[in-house]
Amino acid sequence: MGLPRPGLWLKRLWVLVQVAVEVAVGKVLMTLFPERVKQNILAMGQKTGIAQNPNFAQDSWIPTFFSTQYFWFVLKVRWQRLEDATEPGGLAPNCSVVRLSGQQCSVWDFMRGNRPLVLNFGSCTUPSFLSKFDQFKRLIQDFSSIADFLIIYIEEAHASDGWAFKNNVDIKNHRNLQDRLRAASLLLARSPQCPVVVDTMQNQSSQLYAALPERLYVLRQGRILYKGESGPWNYNPEEVRAVLEELHS
């Protein structure tokens, strides 16, 4: 299973070079054509909802692009995608997760018979995850009679000691499981209406589902019916709605 280790490291090296070049070019373009680059980033932000969020003025997040923290986070995401173990129609990884009570369980524990199980991966510091949280809740309200839902809280997208945005939720990178459980418990104030679990500190589910910074899946009977594109730009709960409507028709 997976890539042979030498092959994996070669691919990681190539990705490292790619990200380094992208960041270097981005820095140059930001210096030479600052307004044009900012407008391009802002246009992408329209898709995530961050551009419409009054807490995020342009200068609170756009200048962080192509920074050192940006480089390391993007590199982590790209490296993670090399270990993506999922494909539509394939077997869904049965990863270990932890309930907010501290009890260990697995993703498959939340599947019931022939009912679809919607997985929502994300974190409180990911603005698009929170801005579309109400859309996800409406999915639960509309389809709870035919489907089950599970939020899997993963490592922070924009931790205050990482690639941080101004005026964002202030959560540092999780150093232990208790940190992650405390961060996930903040979602309870938003009345998620479905179980919330956290990824292990080995980030097993995040890696195998290539979920960082956020992603949606629909599973049924242990297999993947729908694999959403990775966030933040392509995180779209309405695509899940279309899948569930088709199953219900």
From Swiss-Prot:
Coiled coil: none annotated. The chain crosses the membrane at residues 13-33. It is an enzyme of class 1 (oxidoreductase). It is a single-pass type III membrane protein. Gene3D superfamilies: Glutaredoxin. It is found in: Cell membrane; Endoplasmic reticulum membrane; Basolateral cell membrane. Keywords: Cell membrane, Endoplasmic reticulum, Membrane, Oxidoreductase, Selenocysteine, Thyroid hormones biosynthesis, Transmembrane, Transmembrane helix. Its EC number is 1.21.99.3, 1.21.99.4. The active site is at U126. Predominantly monomer. Can form homodimers but homodimerization is not essential for enzyme activity. This is Type I iodothyronine deiodinase. The gene is DIO1.
